[in-house]
């Protein structure tokens, strides 16, 4: 699942991947726009509480805003609203995950976090190979 998210994230201008405090995250100029981890017992209980799932679960967190954030917040599973940031959104990754939707959400999150110069560069280059 990490590789599938990374396949989109690494096509975005100057994005880079790094190990996070847990899991893997993708960043643009020091801002995290996507983070994949396994929510499990212990110090990650806040993820379990946010998802409502007690077993170890792979999750993606990303940034969203406006109408999209509102729609995702109301959508229910596989989406959940983490409490730690007003723009943070989460998605449980599982067998039935719509990977085209993940690519779109990761790209939108990048647009939210990236400087406008890079967003314009992305707009000129068109959709990522994953979105085509």
Predicted regions, residues:
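Charge-dense, helix-prone N-terminal extensions
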Residues: 1-132
